[in-house]
Design a protein with these regions (language model features):
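Aromatic-lined carbohydrate-recognition surfaces of secreted/lumenal glycan-active proteins
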Residues: 1-31, 78-91
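Substrate-binding cleft of secreted/luminal carbohydrate-active enzymes
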Residues: 34-146
Length: 146
Protein backbone atom coordinates (compact mmCIF):
# COMPACT_ATOMS: atom_id res chain seq x y z
CA UNK A 1 0.00 0.00 0.00
CA UNK A 2 1.27 3.46 -0.75
CA UNK A 3 1.76 5.58 2.36
CA UNK A 4 0.89 8.80 0.52
CA UNK A 5 -2.58 8.93 2.06
CA UNK A 6 -3.35 12.51 1.06
CA UNK A 7 -3.59 11.43 -2.58
CA UNK A 8 -4.29 7.70 -2.27
CA UNK A 9 -8.04 8.32 -2.30
CA UNK A 10 -7.63 8.89 -6.05
CA UNK A 11 -7.31 5.12 -6.50
CA UNK A 12 -10.24 4.34 -4.22
CA UNK A 13 -8.30 3.01 -1.25
CA UNK A 14 -8.85 4.00 2.37
CA UNK A 15 -6.31 2.04 4.39
CA UNK A 16 -6.82 4.13 7.54
CA UNK A 17 -8.68 3.11 10.67
CA UNK A 18 -12.45 3.65 10.56
CA UNK A 19 -11.89 5.55 13.83
CA UNK A 20 -9.78 8.14 12.01
CA UNK A 21 -11.82 11.22 11.07
CA UNK A 22 -10.49 11.75 7.57
CA UNK A 23 -12.78 14.70 6.85
CA UNK A 24 -11.27 16.67 9.74
CA UNK A 25 -7.81 16.61 8.12
CA UNK A 26 -8.81 16.41 4.45
CA UNK A 27 -12.04 18.41 4.09
CA UNK A 28 -11.36 19.16 0.42
CA UNK A 29 -11.97 15.58 -0.64
CA UNK A 30 -13.21 13.47 2.28
CA UNK A 31 -16.85 13.38 3.26
CA UNK A 32 -17.97 12.81 6.84
CA UNK A 33 -18.68 9.18 5.93
CA UNK A 34 -15.33 8.50 4.25
CA UNK A 35 -13.98 7.20 7.56
CA UNK A 36 -16.62 4.48 7.53
CA UNK A 37 -14.77 2.83 4.65
CA UNK A 38 -11.38 2.60 6.35
CA UNK A 39 -10.30 -1.02 6.68
CA UNK A 40 -7.19 -1.03 8.87
CA UNK A 41 -9.10 -2.84 11.62
CA UNK A 42 -9.68 -5.80 9.28
CA UNK A 43 -6.01 -6.51 8.67
CA UNK A 44 -3.45 -8.58 10.57
CA UNK A 45 -0.46 -6.56 9.36
CA UNK A 46 0.17 -3.85 6.78
CA UNK A 47 3.14 -3.06 4.55
CA UNK A 48 3.26 0.62 3.64
CA UNK A 49 5.46 1.97 0.90
CA UNK A 50 7.27 5.00 2.29
CA UNK A 51 8.67 5.68 -1.16
CA UNK A 52 10.71 8.85 -1.27
CA UNK A 53 13.90 10.11 -2.86
CA UNK A 54 17.36 9.69 -1.37
CA UNK A 55 17.23 13.23 0.00
CA UNK A 56 13.82 12.77 1.63
CA UNK A 57 14.53 10.20 4.34
CA UNK A 58 13.99 12.18 7.55
CA UNK A 59 11.34 14.76 8.30
CA UNK A 60 7.91 15.38 9.71
CA UNK A 61 5.95 16.05 6.53
CA UNK A 62 4.07 13.40 4.61
CA UNK A 63 6.42 13.24 1.63
CA UNK A 64 9.51 11.69 3.24
CA UNK A 65 10.10 8.21 4.65
CA UNK A 66 9.94 9.11 8.33
CA UNK A 67 6.97 11.40 7.75
CA UNK A 68 5.07 8.73 5.82
CA UNK A 69 5.49 6.34 8.75
CA UNK A 70 4.62 8.97 11.35
CA UNK A 71 1.46 9.85 9.45
CA UNK A 72 0.55 6.18 9.05
CA UNK A 73 0.79 5.62 12.81
CA UNK A 74 -1.71 8.46 13.31
CA UNK A 75 -4.07 7.19 10.59
CA UNK A 76 -4.02 3.56 11.71
CA UNK A 77 -4.84 4.48 15.32
CA UNK A 78 -3.41 1.23 16.67
CA UNK A 79 -5.84 -0.94 14.69
CA UNK A 80 -3.06 -2.80 12.90
CA UNK A 81 0.71 -3.10 13.18
CA UNK A 82 2.61 -1.94 10.11
CA UNK A 83 6.01 -1.88 8.50
CA UNK A 84 7.15 1.03 6.39
CA UNK A 85 9.98 1.09 3.94
CA UNK A 86 11.54 2.57 0.81
CA UNK A 87 11.64 1.70 -2.87
CA UNK A 88 15.39 1.45 -3.38
CA UNK A 89 15.34 0.93 -7.13
CA UNK A 90 12.79 3.25 -8.69
CA UNK A 91 12.48 6.38 -6.57
CA UNK A 92 14.52 9.50 -7.36
CA UNK A 93 18.19 9.05 -6.50
CA UNK A 94 17.89 5.28 -6.11
CA UNK A 95 17.76 4.23 -9.77
CA UNK A 96 21.49 3.94 -10.44
CA UNK A 97 22.58 2.32 -7.17
CA UNK A 98 25.51 3.64 -5.20
CA UNK A 99 23.33 4.70 -2.27
CA UNK A 100 24.48 2.19 0.31
CA UNK A 101 25.19 4.88 2.89
CA UNK A 102 21.49 5.82 2.78
CA UNK A 103 20.22 2.32 3.61
CA UNK A 104 20.90 2.47 7.38
CA UNK A 105 19.18 5.87 7.44
CA UNK A 106 16.05 4.41 5.82
CA UNK A 107 15.96 1.66 8.41
CA UNK A 108 16.36 4.17 11.24
CA UNK A 109 13.75 6.56 9.83
CA UNK A 110 11.10 3.88 9.31
CA UNK A 111 11.57 1.20 11.96
CA UNK A 112 11.70 3.64 14.86
CA UNK A 113 8.26 5.00 13.97
CA UNK A 114 6.61 1.88 12.56
CA UNK A 115 6.29 -1.64 13.93
CA UNK A 116 8.76 -2.98 11.40
CA UNK A 117 10.63 -2.30 8.19
CA UNK A 118 10.40 -3.63 4.67
CA UNK A 119 12.12 -2.83 1.41
CA UNK A 120 10.94 -2.79 -2.16
CA UNK A 121 12.34 -4.57 -3.98
CA UNK A 122 14.67 -7.35 -2.89
CA UNK A 123 16.19 -7.56 -6.37
CA UNK A 124 17.79 -4.14 -5.84
CA UNK A 125 19.64 -5.33 -2.73
CA UNK A 126 21.35 -7.95 -4.84
CA UNK A 127 21.72 -5.75 -7.94
CA UNK A 128 23.46 -2.94 -6.05
CA UNK A 129 25.14 -5.16 -3.44
CA UNK A 130 23.48 -3.45 -0.48
CA UNK A 131 23.79 -6.51 1.78
CA UNK A 132 26.36 -5.02 4.17
CA UNK A 133 24.48 -1.73 4.28
CA UNK A 134 21.33 -3.51 5.41
CA UNK A 135 23.30 -5.49 7.96
CA UNK A 136 24.74 -2.25 9.34
CA UNK A 137 21.30 -0.65 9.51
CA UNK A 138 19.74 -3.58 11.33
CA UNK A 139 22.74 -3.96 13.64
CA UNK A 140 22.51 -0.26 14.50
CA UNK A 141 18.81 -0.65 15.26
CA UNK A 142 19.29 -3.76 17.39
CA UNK A 143 22.08 -2.09 19.34
CA UNK A 144 19.85 0.92 19.99
CA UNK A 145 17.15 -1.17 21.66
CA UNK A 146 19.40 -3.22 23.93
Amino acid sequence: MGAWYSTYYEVGVNWASPKYDTAADYPNWATDRYKDYGYADMLDFMLLGAYASTDEIYGSGEWNMQGFCTNAKKLLMGDVKFAGGPDIGNSTGWTEGGQGDKIPQTIDACINVADGYFVFDMVHIKMYDYWNDFKKGFDDYLNSIQ
